[in-house]
Design a protein with these regions (language model features):
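N-terminal export leaders
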Residues: 11-15
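C-terminal motif of bacterial Sec signal peptides marking the signal peptidase cleavage site
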Residues: 26-29
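Bacterial signal peptide processing site
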Residues: 31-33
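Short, well-ordered beta-strand elements
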Residues: 43, 47-59, 78-84, 152-153
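Short helix-initiation/N-cap motifs at beta->coil->alpha
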Residues: 82-93, 181-208
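A conserved helix-loop-strand patch within extracytoplasmic ligand-binding domains
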Residues: 125-175, 274
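A bilobed periplasmic-binding-protein/Venus flytrap-type ligand-binding module shared by bacterial periplasmic
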Residues: 132-144, 245-258
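Periplasmic-binding protein-like
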Residues: 162-170, 268-288
Length: 290
């Protein structure tokens, strides 16, 4: 049961890079229309229905959005044009350039880091759900304490998720971090008793890299995509209660008061969606954040 960096390697992301480029081009080509009156890029109003172009990572984000589209959107005069995106950068670049009206995939720490690094003018308008990050292994271990000295631990490479993963490793007792650093990197590891090699790869590649490592720290959505059951398979799992890592519905700050986006935020925090999440992910891998 679950308990509740970096000699960097060359990223295994040539294919992923090509995919990112292709998705970005597709979004630019088909998603940059404004609304009928030109007020919000990524929203088109026709015959009383506002079509919102929204980008999301596959699991569980696209699944949640598709349920909202199929069950709630029409009643609010909305239609969701859902763009499935497999990386952590394109949803924000596409929101920034107007290809999307909103995105749904990121946590507050990641959003803060992106705003600071890229200068985005974004804001969250709804906390939707939590996907606990976990420490996994393919070695058959039942405890992180079984990890070999000098072994490799794979983490998500974007700074916010690297920091989140490092904090989970600290919770597991594998490393100690400088407590004065809010978003730590490998440079802030002050103790590493097992001399673990902390390696980062693209988030979508962490689960695939698990076979070559002692441990892998995997985001909840990528664990689901890899067929893992967090409550069963994780050696250590983040607690869901009072988590600072809610997945958010994010829009451009200038658009936060748009009536159609406000309606969408309401649907994303509706009792109906809460019940759907609780009934669908009964293993606790996805937890409502509202």
């Amino acid at each position: 049961m679950p308990r509740s960096i970096r000699p960097f390697i060359t990223r295994r992301s040539v294919l992923a890079g090509s995919l990112v480029s292709a998705v970005a081009l597709a979004l630019t080509a088909c998603g940059s229309k404004g609304s009928a009156d030109g007020s919000v890029k990524g929203i088109e109003v026709k015959d009383g229905v506002a079509t919102i172009t929204i980008g999301a990572t596959p699991q569980p984000h696209v699944t949640i959005l598709q349920w909202v589209q199929d069950n709630l959107a029409a009643g609010a005069g909305l239609s969701l044009d859902i763009k499935e995106i497999d990386d952590y950068q394109t949803p924000n670049t596409s929101l920034d350039d107007g290809s999307l009206a909103a995105n749904f995939y990121q946590t507050p720490n990641f959003l803060k880091q992106q705003i600071e690094e890229k200068g985005y003018d974004f804001v969250s308008i709804a906390d939707v759900h939590i996907e606990p990050m976990g420490i996994y292994t393919s070695k058959g271990y039942t405890s992180v304490d079984q990890a070999a000295n000098g072994g490799t631990v794979v983490l998500n490479s974007d700074p916010a998720n690297t920091a989140r993963g490092l904090k989970l490793l600290q919770t597991a007792g594998l490393i100690t971090l400088d407590p004065s650093v809010e978003i730590p990197s490998d440079l802030d590891v002050t103790a590493n008793p097992k001399n673990l090699k902390l390696v980062t790869v693209d988030g979508a590649q962490v689960a695939a890299s698990m076979a070559d490592a002692e441990l892998a720290v995997i985001n909840g959505n990528y664990a689901l995509q890899a067929g893992l059951v967090p409550s069963r398979d994780a050696l250590v799992l983040e607690p869901g209660e009072h988590s600072p890592y809610a997945n958010e519905l994010v829009v451009r700050t200038a658009d936060k008061g748009n009536e159609h986006l406000v309606k969408l935020a309401g649907l994303m925090n509706s009792p109906e969606l809460k019940a759907y999440i609780e009934q669908t992910w009964t293993d606790g891998s996805v937890i409502p954040a509202f």
